[in-house]
From Swiss-Prot:
UniProt keyword Signal present: yes
Organismal lineage: Eukaryota, Metazoa, Ecdysozoa, Arthropoda, Hexapoda
Keywords assigned: Repeat, Signal
An MF annotation (GO) of this entry: structural constituent of egg chorion
Organism the protein comes from: Bombyx mori
InterPro entries hit by this protein: Chorion
Stated name of the protein: Chorion class B protein ERB4
GO biological process terms on file: chorion-containing eggshell formation
Keyword rRNA processing: no
Residues annotated as signal peptide: 1-20
Length: 194
């Protein structure tokens, strides 16, 4: 019996992931009581039947206030911190005696270390000039995803409204530069990319 409940819950989770919508924490920001982003004028007076936020919740910003401080809650950047052990695959060792000035130059792999071991006589001098690159390791540039432009459905005059003469916000021949239904969300989850 418990396996049936688990299968039911997992199936519900997969269905929600497949057919749900991402409206962000504050809805689609178009205001008004007919802010049905989920249905957006597919019928029923052309205003949408989803209610505010497209979920019938009624009101904007229906979540905890602390979520505004979380970068991942509105599609912002995601900070990644990674640490690893020092590389051990490259070693430079010498037991020779050098007299005079010695210069060694080259590039070691990033995240490398340098060490000088040995005894220097009082008349000699030893030193290391070691730098660790420019700090650009791995991903060097991240930009916000811009919304998809020039592919949305526009304002359709009276196609799905209650009467042919009434303007309705629905599917139509118009193409908008802002996305679906003249004020689309573009691409991305949660953040408003207008």
């Amino acid at each position: 019996m418990s396996s049936n409940v688990i299968v039911l819950c997992v199936s519900a989770l997969f269905i929600q992931c497949a057919v749900s919508q991402c409206v962000g924490r504050i809805g689609s920001l178009r205001g008004g009581p007919f802010d049905g982003w989920g249905y957006d004028g597919l019928g029923y007076d052309g205003f949408g039947i989803g209610g505010w936020n497209g979920r019938g919740c009624g009101g904007l910003g229906d979540d905890i206030a602390a979520a505004a401080a979380l970068g991942a809650s509105h599609g912002g950047t995601l900070a990644v911190v990674s640490t690893s052990a020092a590389p051990t695959g490259l070693g430079i060792a010498s037991e020779n005696v050098y007299e005079g000035s010695v210069g060694v130059c080259g590039n070691l792999p990033f995240l490398g270390t340098a060490d000088v071991a040995g005894e220097f006589p009082t008349a000699g001098l030893g030193g290391i000039d070691y730098t660790c690159g420019d700090g650009a390791v791995g991903i060097t540039v991240e930009n916000a995803i811009n919304g998809i432009s020039n592919v949305g459905y526009g304002l359709a005059p009276g196609i799905v409204g209650p009467a042919v003469a009434a303007p309705a916000l629905g599917y139509g021949p118009g193409i908008s530069s802002l996305g679906y239904n003249t004020a689309g969300r573009g691409c991305g989850c949660g953040a408003n990319y207008y």
